[in-house]
Amino acid sequence: MLDRVETIACGFMSIGIKPKDLVGIMAETSPLWTQVDLALCCLGSVSVTIFPSLSIKETSFILNDSLCRYLIVGNEDILDRIMKGYRNIPSLEKIIVLDFNYQSKDDRIIGLNEILELGKKNRFDKYAEYLSYRDSIKNEDWYTVVYTSGSSGMPRGIVLTHFSIASRMTGAFEFWSRYGMSISEKDVSLCYLPLAYIFDRASCQFVSIFSGACIAYADSPGTILDDIRK
């Protein structure tokens, strides 16, 4: 896990992603979602979460409002949707597709496999710089921007700092301890909520990773009972 995250981080650096850059993530819940989020986190970059079900109008608003320079999409269907409105997102420079087999002749688009290859190729040269970024992150630095659903108007961005996430994790551990529960490397946690929500990222993903537990990813919220049996 650590090796993959650091390779992705070095690949991100190779295409110009820097600390404090805002990077959109618009993808279904998956292990890759977690890995790219952690890579951005370790770089000191800021993830901007976007539900993959949003329309191009709503997505364009979020990307323009946050001034995202980069966008990570989960598949080609989402990519096609974004490309139809690309001209209306002036800050967007490059799109990363979370597909190992994706190849593009468009300089604006890059597949995950190419990110990994760049990370492996440049890791020796980039690693010291990566460590300096990771180790200089402060509590008050932004970790993520989470947008509201927009049910009462256009979505609004909520900034969460690294301290906010650490505090959420501490709260989760304290809650479990209060009721005589714990989590360790012997446990498996089931992730079924969209990772665009902060609750699952902080209270499930990061707590599980910190504790060495395995994370299983549900096919969808509707299949949760079958996934638990598996």
Report the location of each language-model feature:
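Conserved AMP-binding/adenylate-forming core of the ANL superfamily
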Residues: 1-38, 55-60, 111-119, 160
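A short helix-loop-beta submotif of the ANL/AMP-binding
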Residues: 10, 22, 28-56, 64-70, ...
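Structural core segment of the AMP-binding/adenylate-forming
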Residues: 15, 42-118
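Conserved S/T- and glycine-rich ATP-binding loop of Class I adenylate-forming
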Residues: 23, 40, 71, 142, ...
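Short acidic loop-to-helix transition motifs that present clustered carboxylates
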Residues: 32, 54-57, 78, 174, ...
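Conserved pre-ATP/AMP-binding loop-to-beta segment of ANL
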Residues: 97, 117-147, 154, 180-188
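Conserved AMP-binding/adenylation subdomain of ANL enzymes
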Residues: 166-191, 195-230
